């Protein structure tokens, strides 16, 4: 049995042997744990509150044998050669030859998103589209990525008309469903994630590498955590194990001198004493259909002007599964996270007020010289898988070797 599949029980006296404790077994925790164990010689304990590893990337076969992503679709995409090579140690890949492509259902019509020159030619007649294409290239340059809010500022009436179409049919209602806010209220970092592309590129991402692990994300995480120096404990809240006292962290009543890498929700670590950090959560509705296809070969369809859900994912097109019996889809319904049982904080709602609240919690951690915050929950920010992997690798590199490793050199 792989170490990652075990729920281990260990004698109290052995707990003080660990050089590092990693809280959370998602991409952040698993990467830093592997690096500390392998490169720094640390004995690492990974504590995971859920009953499985892999964080929100966790996948599993459903009752019909179709591999599904339990917490919504996750796709690895990157231009970082070092990150791609690192994760390739633990998985082979199904790389998308033509990139990951997404379409929007606009009143029953499917158009490529991000909005690009192909989309332009779909909604305008040939002559008008050619003239508008020339204007867009002249204003922004061929191949550029223009955030919708910036496009709306262009004084040219024809470009404004394009911007208004995109705003109303691609961004506005979808954004309000996803975030519970208008685009004007949302951080530019968020609205800039899906720009208007001045190109004929239908790919949702423009990264060199795009795809999913060949045998699933879970298998990749199992291999990452399968190391003689790593112990994995699932189904445990870290607060059952660690006590945070003034200026020191206790491990079952004894001061812990090693590193604690925390990847969970920072406000919940402190029992939300200043109030909850606002997040958007998601409700997922899985459905299996006794038919070969539901979305005409599209893995993801965004519903930008209709429906209460934001998108539908058809998993067999995401994972390229060939032996699927029927097809399984998932609908996503966003809502405001309240901290109730079963709710999961997915997306930090970034604005100055929420950042100030986060900084209050972060200040509480400064008394612990051996506590490190890592990940989208601990840092209250958005990360793609590649950026999170890179950050975890850098953190591991910055930490010292364990004492026994130093003595061997």
What kind of feature is each model-predicted range?
Residues 20-46:
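N-terminal Rossmann-like FAD-binding beta1-loop-alpha1 element of flavoenzymes
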Residues 109-110, 114-258:
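Active-site/ligand-binding neighborhood in enzyme catalytic cores
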Residues 64-139:
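Dinucleotide-binding Rossmann-like beta1-alpha1 core, especially the glycine-rich loop
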Residues 344-409:
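C-terminal catalytic lobe of FAD-dependent flavoproteins
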Residues 37-61:
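Glycine-rich FAD pyrophosphate-binding loop
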Residues 39, 240-364:
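Mid-domain catalytic core of redox enzymes
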């Amino acid at each position: 049995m792989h170490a990652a599949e075990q729920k281990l029980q260990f004698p109290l006296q052995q707990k003080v042997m660990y050089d590092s404790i990693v809280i959370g077994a998602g991409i952040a925790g698993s990467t830093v744990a592997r690096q500390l164990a392998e490169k720094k010689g640390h004995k690492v304990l990974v504590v995971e509150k859920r009953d499985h590893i892999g964080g929100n990337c966790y996948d599993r076969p459903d009752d019909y044998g179709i591999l599904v992503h339990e917490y919504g679709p996750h796709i690895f995409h990157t231009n970082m050669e070092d990150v791609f090579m690192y994760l390739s140690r633990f998985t082979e890949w199904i790389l998308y030859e033509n990139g990951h492509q997404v379409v929007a259902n606009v009143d029953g019509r499917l158009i490529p998103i991000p909005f690009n020159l192909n989309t332009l030619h779909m909604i305008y007649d040939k002559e008008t589209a050619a003239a508008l294409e020339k204007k867009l290239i002249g204003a922004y340059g061929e191949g550029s990525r223009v955030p919708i809010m910036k496009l709306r500022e262009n004084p040219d009436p024809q470009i404004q008309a394009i911007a208004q179409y995109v705003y109303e049919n691609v961004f506005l209602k979808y954004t309000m469903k996803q975030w519970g806010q208008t685009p004007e209220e949302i951080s530019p970092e968020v609205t800039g994630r899906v720009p208007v592309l001045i190109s004929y590129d239908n790919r949702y991402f423009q990264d060199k590498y795009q795809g999913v692990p060949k045998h699933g994300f879970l298998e990749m995480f199992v291999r990452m955590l399968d190391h003689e120096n790593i112990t994995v404990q699932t189904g445990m809240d870290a607060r059952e194990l660690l006590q945070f006292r003034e200026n020191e962290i206790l491990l079952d009543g004894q001061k812990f001198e090693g590193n604690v890498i925390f990847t969970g929700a920072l406000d919940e670590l402190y029992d939300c004493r200043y109030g909850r950090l606002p997040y958007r959560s998601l409700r997922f509705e899985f459905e299996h259909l006794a038919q070969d296809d539901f979305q005409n070969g599209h893995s993801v369809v965004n519903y930008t002007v209709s429906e209460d859900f934001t998108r539908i994912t058809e998993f067999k097109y995401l994972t390229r599964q060939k032996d699927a019996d029927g097809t399984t889809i998932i609908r996503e319904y966003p809502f405001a996270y309240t901290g109730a049982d079963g709710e999961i904080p997915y997306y930090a709602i970034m604005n100055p007020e929420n950042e100030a609240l986060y900084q209050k919690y972060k200040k509480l951690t400064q008394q612990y010289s051996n506590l490190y915050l890592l990940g989208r929950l601990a840092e209250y920010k958005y990360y793609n898988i590649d950026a999170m992997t890179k950050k975890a690798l850098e953190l591991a590199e910055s930490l010292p070797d364990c004492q026994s490793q130093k003595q061997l050199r």
